[in-house]
UniProtKB/Swiss-Prot annotation:
Protein known as: ATPase expression protein 2, mitochondrial
Keyword Transmembrane among UniProt keywords: no
Organism of derivation: Zygosaccharomyces rouxii (strain ATCC 2623 / CBS 732 / NBRC 1130 / NCYC 568 / NRRL Y-229)
Pfam families: ATP13
Record localization: Mitochondrion
Keyword Mitochondrion appears in the UniProt entry: yes
InterPro entries given in the database record: ATPase_expression_mit
UniProt family annotation: Belongs to the AEP2 family.
Record GO terms (molecular function): RNA binding
Subunit structure: Binds to the 5'UTR of the OLI1 mRNA.
One BP term from GO: regulation of translation
Domain of life assignment: Eukaryota
Biological classification of the source: Eukaryota, Fungi, Dikarya, Ascomycota, Saccharomycotina
Function statement: Required for translation of the mitochondrial OLI1 transcript coding for the mitochondrial ATP synthase subunit 9.
Length: 550
């Protein structure tokens, strides 16, 4: 056990990789708390207890609490290794080794997340509140958590397990009236998780719990950016993936949801704008109050633009953009816009006005004023998706708008001497456009420059859906080659652009199938032409005989 007199700087240096320290720093930064330049030394336990009861802690208090409650007990390695029995020691072993998913599985299977059992851990000291906060923070930050927690308890969705953890957090960690920056950070993680899983009712419960202890006026006064963004998403329509849009070529069909094509996107059954009055209040505070001047960000502006777009207030979008992002304005943000902001502008105009012209004009202005702006795959994916949805297949058989977006994407990368990065979402959006317009050259460009450019990388691991899409591109190209009668090019493609011997054999078989179909069509067309010619000759001969009789 570290001695109490050990300085905090020594503790942090010895355990700079401690997860709890990262958690406390992230919590303080996300809530806008300022870190003092000179940290005071550790005081007595009575002073620390008084600090923990304050409604808002400074970063220094959070670090002090992290050291006292978590770092010192965690660093007593000899004591841990000698304690081999009892469930409490096993829980701490999981925490020490970073096995947060396994800990949840153990609690779920052995105790079914029993409330009395968790309460007992807090009472007996088997689990501290700081350790539980760390557990929540790291668990919800793990990738593919839904896959790891699938079927932990039969017929119990993993979101129910997470919601159970949230209920424990509210009952045992949070004070009845106030929220610390660390607690606000943890609750925001629950919010993000439930929104990502399309569990909007659960997300609303978390947000309402936060608003009871920190109302909207307090969020605006304290410039709580992250929570305000979640508020706009849940109550003001800023969740664009749940928006409904009517495809241009299917005006009489059911509207589709913007996010339904994404393989990793969970969709809610319903999504409604719940609060129209507060949006103007939020905009006035963000633009008018001095404490927001250095707290605004492209992410927050994107959420506000989505909210305005959901209401159809495209005129206000242009005014907001001119007010916040005009380089000539002193109050304008001094950072560059990002893809999230540009996607918000484009989506809002396209979905509510039904055309991309105005949205593209605003985007051109952004790119002209901010030449260093980065357009990531998310931007190009949404650009192609919107162009496909607005494509009227009867009036525009060549998909001029979609191919124009594809050309702009290639030009943007070429001007910066970059290769087009591989992105499954982009390739998936392009495939039906190429097939419908029979654009073999575009598909060949995707195969040769994007797909195989990524697959040859040693660290790249192809997924089943990516492999399936690649095979679709290959078969489409071979079909178009076969139907044009270019047999040599077909076998050359199979030889050069197959990724395995099995794939090569399948491509050759597929090519021969369509080659046979093409030959049958040619033979059938030749017979039809011969029959028509014969019929014409007979008619001409009859006319000549009739002429002689006359």
């Amino acid at each position: 056990m570290l001695r109490t007199a050990c300085s905090r700087s020594h503790v942090f240096k010895a355990f700079s990789s401690s997860l709890m320290l990262e958690h406390a720093l992230a919590a303080a930064n996300s809530s806008g708390a300022a870190a003092p330049t000179n940290a005071a030394s550790t005081g007595n336990s009575h002073d620390s207890t008084l600090k923990s009861e304050l409604p808002l802690r400074t970063l220094n208090d959070e670090l002090h609490n992290a050291e006292r409650k978590y770092i010192k007990p965690l660093t007593n390695a000899p004591e841990w290794s000698s304690t081999r029995t009892g469930p409490n020691s096993k829980i701490r072993e999981y925490l020490k080794n970073g096995q947060y998913t396994k800990l949840l599985i153990r609690l779920s299977v052995d105790n079914h997340l029993n409330n009395e059992y968790i309460s007992g851990l807090f009472t007996t000291g088997g689990l501290t509140k700081s350790e539980y906060s760390l557990f929540i923070n790291k668990l919800l930050s793990e990738e593919e958590l839904d896959v790891k927690l699938s079927n932990v308890i039969p017929d119990t969705p993993h979101t129910e397990l997470i919601y159970k953890l949230y209920e424990f957090y509210c009952d045992h960690i949070v004070d009845q009236h106030n929220l610390t920056p660390l607690q606000l950070y943890d609750l925001n993680l629950f919010l993000k998780t439930f929104i990502a899983e399309a569990q909007l009712s659960k997300a609303h419960n978390v947000l309402d719990f936060i608003l009871l202890r920190r109302p909207l006026n307090d969020l605006l006064a304290n410039t709580d950016v992250e929570i305000l963004i979640q508020f706009l998403r849940l109550k003001c329509g800023a969740l664009s993936k749940f928006w409904k849009i009517q495809p241009a070529s299917q005006r009489n069909s059911t509207a589709i949801t913007l996010g339904e094509k994404a393989s990793d996107c969970h969709l809610a059954k319903s999504y409604k704008f719940q609060n129209e009055k507060v949006l103007l209040q939020i905009i006035n505070s963000v633009l008018g109050e001095h404490n927001w001047k250095n707290r605004r960000s492209p992410k927050l502006d994107a959420a506000i633009i989505y909210s305005l777009g959901y209401l159809g207030q495209t005129d206000l979008i242009e005014k907001y953009v001119n007010r916040t992002w005009s380089p000539s304005k002193d109050e304008g943000v001094k950072t560059n816009p990002n893809s999230d902001l540009l996607v918000a502008v484009l989506t809002s105009y396209c979905v509510k006005e039904g055309n991309m012209r105005k949205g593209l004009e605003v985007l051109d202005r952004f790119i002209r004023d901010y030449p260093e702006v980065e357009l990531d795959p998310l931007f190009w994916r949404r650009l192609l998706q919107l162009s496909s949805l607005l494509w009227d297949k009867k009036r525009d058989r060549k998909a001029t708008l979609s191919h124009g977006c594809w050309t702009i994407m290639k030009q943007w990368h070429a001007q910066r001497q970059r290769k087009i990065p591989y992105d499954y979402g982009i390739m998936k959006e392009l495939y039906p456009i190429f097939v419908r317009t029979k654009n073999k050259n575009g598909a060949l460009e995707v195969i040769t420059k994007s797909f195989f450019g990524a697959f040859i990388q040693p660290e790249f691991t192809i997924r089943p859906n990516e492999l399936s899409l690649l095979c679709k591109y290959q078969r489409f190209i071979l079909k178009m080659i076969a139907l044009k009668g270019n047999y040599h090019k077909g076998f050359e493609f199979c030889q050069e652009w197959s990724f395995s011997s099995t794939n090569k054999f399948e491509l050759q078989s597929y090519f021969m199938k369509w080659r046979g179909i093409h030959e049958q069509r040619r033979t059938s067309q030749s017979k039809q032409k011969a029959a028509l010619q014969e019929k014409y000759d007979e008619m001409e001969e009859d006319d000549m005989l009739l002429g002689r009789l006359w």
